A protein has these predicted regions:
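Sec-dependent N-terminal signal peptides
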Residues: 15-23
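Acidic/polar, low-complexity intrinsically disordered N-terminal segments immediately downstream
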Residues: 32-112, 261-309
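Active-site recognition of the HExxH zinc-binding catalytic motif
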Residues: 171-191
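Auxiliary, metal-adjacent structural segments of Zn-dependent hydrolase domains
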Residues: 91-152
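Short pre-active-site segment immediately N-terminal to the catalytic Zn-binding motif
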Residues: 158-177
Length: 309
């Protein structure tokens, strides 16, 4: 009868609903009882070496600087073919940078009692070492170091250095580091705009590459690169005064001619006054400290990097 057919249809619907509820409940129960398996990725922090612990104490905690010696593609310019820095060379360079750059400023400020946290505050936050050199394809010039917006300094050709050759260290690294650090400082506190007018007619964004050192001196530049533009000129004066050996500055002035020597001396005097007025940096005292420390590098190279220093 029609009524019986209707009853059968309703019973089928009830059974289907009941079956669906049963199966769903079973699936939920099964899922709740399953345990997540171990990750296929290694989630354990990498083991720290004795060198890593030394960097943690002497760079991260002391100066808030991340000293990277392992090659990381996220940090490096991958348009170049890079080779990782050798660990032993990295250890020596880490000691030298701390002793010859960071601690030189510390020693100067300790004498005056001001700006004791200067390097912790203003030094670049990342120092990255690359074992190989980098060649600029557009100019075929070798890049020894570079900086990115005052945050990171990249030092190349680490595997080729002789840690005891101070002249090589200055050419490869410390001239670059003082150069880039001076950029950081003048970007925070501007130097006098009058400086830009001293050699205004002789700056050339590309022509500087064709000038010899002597030609640059006679135009009033301490290096050919200083003739690129005023800001580079300003920081080159500071960097070269700090790292060049005794006698270099006097020889440069003697060979620059009357006009060139006068321009270089005027630039130096302005840079010296600005460093003292803006940052309490006595550039002559700082240079004295750097030169003295340069003569004692051997004394720190063989120091052990122990965890109980």
């Amino acid at each position: 009868t029609p009524d019986n057919n209707e009853i059968r249809k309703n019973m089928k619907k009830i059974l289907l609903y009941a079956l669906a509820i049963f199966l769903t409940g079973g699936m939920i129960s099964s899922c709740s009882e399953d345990k997540l398996g171990d990750s296929i990725f290694d989630t354990n922090p990498p083991a720290r070496t004795e060198f890593d612990n030394w960097l943690l104490r002497n760079y991260v905690k002391e100066y808030n600087i991340d000293f990277k010696y392992r090659l990381e593609d996220i940090e490096a310019n991958m348009s170049y073919n890079h080779i990782p820095a050798e660990v032993e060379k990295s250890k020596k360079l880490a000691k030298i940078i701390k002793y010859l750059w960071l601690e030189s400023y510390d020693e100067m400020f300790d004498k005056t009692g001001v700006n004791k946290d200067f390097m912790r505050t203003y030094a670049p936050k990342v120092i990255l070492l690359i074992g190989s050199s980098a060649i600029n394809p557009s100019s075929s010039t070798e890049i020894l170091g570079s900086a990115e917006e005052g945050i990171k300094v990249v030092l190349y050709k680490v595997n080729s250095i002789d840690p005891t050759d101070v002249e090589m260290l200055n050419e490869y690294y410390f001239e670059t580091m003082h150069h880039e650090f001076a950029h950081i400082l003048h970007q925070k506190k501007s130097y006098p705009t009058e400086y830009n007018q001293i050699s205004a007619a002789d700056y050339s964004s590309t022509g500087w590459q064709n000038r010899t050192e002597l030609q640059a001196w006679k135009l009033g530049f301490v290096t050919p690169y200083a003739g690129m533009q005023p800001q580079e000129d300003f920081v080159e004066v500071i960097a070269n005064y700090l790292v060049k050996p005794d006698g270099f500055w006097e020889n440069m002035l003697a060979n620059a001619g009357t006009e060139g020597a006068a321009k270089i001396q005027t630039k130096f005097d302005m840079a010296k006054e600005w460093l003292m007025a803006s940052w309490s940096i006595d550039i002559e005292e700082l240079r004295t400290i750097i030169i003295r420390r340069s003569e004692n590098i051997d004394s720190i190279l063989n120091e052990k990097m122990t965890d109980n220093e």
